[in-house]
Amino acid sequence: LHHQIIPVLSQHQTPTHALQSHHHIPVMATQQPTQPPQPMMPMPGQHSVTPTQHHQSNLPQPGQQPFQPQFPQKPTHRPIQPQAPVHPMPPMPQPQLPPMFPLQPLPPLLPDLPLEPWPAS
């Protein structure tokens, strides 16, 4: 890759720019994004091999691996899913409200208890 870039830069007839462009070249930026995916792929492979050796640690390691990949996916899906369910949600609360009414009598009972001590005192 570097060999290909050097000739292209040399054509510009600006050796100074060639050096600067090398520093500014997005090669560094491209490497950063590519590095995370690459390590992620080998990481699971290595872990999968180690668990076979350590049966006990196999349980925790695999458990953590699946969770990690899921976490990034869940957050992305969560915002999308809630939006769709949010519309059906309003109708859902309505049927749920009736059960809430029986709960309302409970709060009054609590105030009754304090009311009794008041006169008693």
UniProtKB/Swiss-Prot annotation:
Record-level GO cellular component terms: extracellular region
Localization annotation: Secreted, Extracellular space, Extracellular matrix
Domain of life assignment: Eukaryota
Major site of localization recorded for this protein: secreted
Keyword ATP-binding on entry: no
SMART domains attached to this UniProt entry: Amelogenin
InterPro entries recorded: Amelogenin
Keywords for the protein's UniProt record, in alphabetical order: Biomineralization, Extracellular matrix, Repeat, Secreted
GO MF terms, alphabetically ordered: structural constituent of tooth enamel
One Pfam family from the record: Amelogenin
Skewed-composition ranges (Pro residues): 85-121
GO terms for biological process, alphabetical: enamel mineralization
Compositional bias annotation for Polar residues: 10-19, 47-59
Key word Repeat present: yes
Disulfide bonds: none
Positions of the UniProt region annotated as Disordered: 1-121
Low complexity bias: start-end ranges: 60-84
Family: Belongs to the amelogenin family.
Protein purpose: Plays a role in the biomineralization of teeth. Seems to regulate the formation of crystallites during the secretory stage of tooth enamel development. Thought to play a major role in the structural organization and mineralization of developing enamel.
Official protein name in the record: Amelogenin
